[in-house]
């Protein structure tokens, strides 16, 4: 049950970020906000894309 819930959440996230992804995503080391999911890698740690 946990797995399917996780993938559903992930899918929803990807849907929500598709627009910003298609315009431009930030590279590794770029400053980012965890809430905006704007990194190419998808991971934002300590204010930087990982």
Swiss-Prot record:
PROSITE patterns, sorted: OMEGA_CONOTOXIN (PS60004)
Tissues in which the protein is found: Expressed by the venom duct.
Gene Ontology terms for molecular function: calcium channel regulator activity; ion channel inhibitor activity; toxin activity
Signal sequence range: 1
Propeptide: 2-24
Site (Key residue for inhibiting Cav2.2/CACNA1B): residue numbering on this chain: 27, 33, 35
An example Gene Ontology CC term for this record: extracellular region
Consequence recorded when altering residue 36 to M: No change in ability to inhibit Cav2.2/CACNA1B
Keywords: Amidation, Calcium channel impairing toxin, Disulfide bond, Ion channel impairing toxin, Knottin, Neurotoxin, Secreted, Signal, Toxin, Voltage-gated calcium channel impairing toxin
Disulfide bonds: 25-40, 32-44, 39-49
Modified residues annotated as Cysteine amide in this record: 49
Localization per Swiss-Prot or TrEMBL: Secreted
InterPro entries the UniProt entry points to: Conotoxin_omega-typ_CS (IPR012321)
UniProt effect for mutating residue 33 to S: Small increase in ability to inhibit Cav2.2/CACNA1B
Main location: secreted
Family: Belongs to the conotoxin O1 superfamily.
Entry domain remark: The presence of a 'disulfide through disulfide knot' structurally defines this protein as a knottin.
Extra information: Shows very weak activity on Cav2.1/CACNA1A (27.36% current inhibition at 10 uM) and Cav1.1/CACNA1S (2.82% current inhibition at 10 uM), and no activity on sodium (Nav) and potassium (Kv) channels in rat DRG neurons.
Function per UniProt: Omega-conotoxins act at presynaptic membranes, they bind and block voltage-gated calcium channels (Cav). This toxin selectively and potently inhibits depolarization-activated rat Cav2.2/CACNA1B currents (IC(50)=89 nM), when coexpressed with alpha-2/delta-1 (CACNA2D1) and beta-3 (CACNB3) subunits. In vivo, is lethal to fish and displays potent analgesic activity in mice pain models of hot plate and acetic acid writhing but has fewer side effects on mouse motor function and lower toxicity in goldfish.
Protein name: Omega-conotoxin Bu8
